[in-house]
């Protein structure tokens, strides 16, 4: 078997979306599984829609996820350049060869003329191009030229055959050539279209397998016809193998749109999804390691991935499942690695100060690693550490529930016990020993009653890292200041929020 060569060739429009990244991932995984090559090129021939910002965003998304490539943008390779906008001379040369070989022909008909011919023949005027110009005489061509018309160039399809191919995802495919009109490969100004340059680049770069989205399935017969024309003029060697990946759907099983917030890859990154979690989840959009194994590493993906195992059915993007898988990958991280990633994330996205003590942060990170689904969750759990004592606001619902009249006694007792602990001994174990002895054993309070009020008083909310560790992180002074402030607000009398 010859070396597998796959490609990822997005257009730089908009923000990277999960469907696009899933395509990149499957190409990457297939290349790595087979020991082949991944080529990364940019299809930027649409000057009105393409932007450098989007171009850079695509590169950033691949680098964030750790999806590397063997040839292409920034890496170089034997088929440079890898941006279509820089390959126009190549396309023009091949277009001239196609013209000379009679594989393409000039078409002068306007859309209105095509519709009129359909109407005159009793056909649906919206049927599309009718191949009229394919058989123009020299005189007719000369007359159109005399009118000042500039032709588009269309590829001659074989309408007397069936276009067949074996799709690695969908099986045997068969399309009647009669249903495929001759299609435009170059505009009247000579500019080549996607219909020409995409397959042409694949041919010139030796692409053996085209793994792409299901939305491009209808174009496959036309591309096969173009490949065959390129083979006849000596530009291509073979028609590649195709595999069309299933749609990614959203709510209601409709195709996930670029406008859907959950389709935006960077929304997930900014919320604190880590690359391992995102890649694991995207792999499941059409593929699985086994029926009962959803969590796996990229090494396992590379070892087991085969494009033939991808299912053709639409794959629904389930945000909750993505977060659950991400939580598993967060827990799988080495503590030091997790701590560094969390710190970088909180400083970049949540405004955490760079000078927050490293030892305290490491302690805090260890407390939340098993309690969060995305890195952003840690900010909600740990924000109380950054809040000045006098600025701490109690979450009303939690305070009403936990700071009732009955909370005064455990708050007073806790303050008394904690005051007796020396500053240098204000650590988790002595704190827990003192409070559990007084509140649980001597006062015979249930832990929920005893500690609920303390938690709300020092953290401002009912959900936090473990209570005694949180007190150690705050330190003796801040802990006591907050407990006294909580006692002053007990029973909590904040007004009910308006519905």
UniProtKB/Swiss-Prot annotation:
A motif ('KMSKS' region) lies at residues 255-259. The gene is gltX. GO terms for cellular component: cytosol. The lineage of its organism: Bacteria, Bacillati, Actinomycetota, Actinomycetes, Mycobacteriales. One of its GO terms (biological process) is glutamyl-tRNA aminoacylation. Belongs to the class-I aminoacyl-tRNA synthetase family. Glutamate--tRNA ligase type 1 subfamily. Catalyzes the attachment of glutamate to tRNA(Glu) in a two-step reaction: glutamate is first activated by ATP to form Glu-AMP and then transferred to the acceptor end of tRNA(Glu). Monomer. Keywords: Aminoacyl-tRNA synthetase, ATP-binding, Cytoplasm, Ligase, Nucleotide-binding, Protein biosynthesis. It is found in: Cytoplasm. This is Glutamate--tRNA ligase. Its EC number is 6.1.1.17. SUPFAM superfamilies: An anticodon-binding domain of class I aminoacyl-tRNA synthetases (SSF48163), Nucleotidylyl transferase (SSF52374). GO terms for molecular function: ATP binding; glutamate-tRNA ligase activity; tRNA binding; zinc ion binding. It holds the Pfam family tRNA-synt_1c. It comes from Corynebacterium urealyticum (strain ATCC 43042 / DSM 7109). It catalyses: tRNA(Glu) + L-glutamate + ATP = L-glutamyl-tRNA(Glu) + AMP + diphosphate. Its main location: cytoplasm. ATP binds at residue 258. It is an enzyme of class 6 (ligase). A motif ('HIGH' region) lies at residues 10-20.
């Amino acid at each position: 078997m010859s070396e597998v060569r796959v490609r990822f060739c997005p257009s730089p429009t908009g923000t990277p979306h999960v469907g696009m990244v899933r395509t990149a991932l499957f190409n990457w995984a297939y290349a790595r599984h087979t020991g082949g090559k991944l080529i990364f090129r940019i299809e930027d021939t649409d000057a009105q829609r393409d932007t450098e910002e989007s171009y850079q965003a695509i590169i950033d998304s691949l680098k964030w996820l750790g999806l590397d490539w063997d040839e292409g943008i920034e890496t170089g390779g034997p088929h440079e350049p890898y941006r279509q906008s820089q390959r126009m001379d190549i396309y023009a040369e091949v277009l001239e060869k196609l013209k000379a070989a009679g594989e393409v022909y000039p078409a002068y008909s306007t859309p209105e003329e095509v519709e009129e011919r359909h109407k005159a023949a009793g056909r649906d005027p919206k049927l599309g191009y009718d191949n009229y110009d394919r058989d123009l005489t020299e005189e007719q061509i000369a007359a159109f030229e005399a009118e000042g018309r500039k032709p588009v160039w269309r590829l001659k399809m074989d309408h007397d055959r069936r276009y067949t191919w074996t799709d690695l995802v969908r099986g045997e495919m068969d399309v009647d050539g009669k249903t495929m009109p001759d299609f435009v490969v170059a505009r009247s100004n000579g500019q080549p279209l996607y219909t020409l340059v995409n397959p042409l680049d694949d041919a010139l770069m030796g692409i053996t397998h085209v793994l792409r989205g299901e939305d491009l399935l209808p174009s496959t017969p036309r591309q096969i016809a173009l490949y065959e024309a390129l083979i006849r003029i000596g530009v291509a060697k073979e028609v590649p193998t195709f595999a069309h990946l299933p749609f990614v759907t959203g709510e209601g099983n409709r195709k996930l749109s670029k406008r859907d917030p959950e389709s935006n890859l960077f929304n997930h990154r900014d919320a604190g999804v880590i690359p391992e979690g995102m890649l694991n989840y995207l792999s499941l959009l059409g593929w699985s390691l086994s029926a009962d194994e959803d969590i796996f590493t990229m090494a396992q993906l590379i070892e087991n991935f085969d494009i033939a195992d991808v299912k053709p059915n639409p794959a629904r993007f389930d945000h909750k499942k993505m977060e659950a898988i991400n939580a598993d990958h967060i827990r799988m991280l080495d503590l030091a690695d997790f701590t560094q990633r969390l710190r970088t994330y909180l400083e970049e996205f949540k405004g955490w100060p760079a000078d927050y003590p490293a030892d305290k942060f490491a302690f805090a990170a260890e407390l939340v690693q098993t309690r969060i689904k995305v890195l952003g969750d840690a900010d909600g759990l740990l924000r109380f550490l950054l809040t000045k004592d006098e600025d701490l606001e109690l979450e009303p619902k939690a305070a009403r529930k936990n700071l009732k009249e009955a909370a005064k006694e455990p708050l007073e007792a806790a303050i008394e016990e904690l005051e007796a602990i020396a500053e240098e001994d204000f650590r988790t174990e002595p704190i827990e020993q003192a409070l559990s002895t007084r509140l649980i054993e001597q006062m015979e309070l249930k832990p929920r009653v005893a500690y609920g009020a303390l938690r709300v008083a020092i953290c401002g909310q009912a959900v936090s890292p473990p209570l005694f560790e949180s007190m150690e992180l705050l330190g003796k002074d801040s802990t006591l200041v907050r407990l006294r402030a909580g006692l002053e607000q007990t029973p909590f009398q904040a007004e009910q929020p308006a519905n």
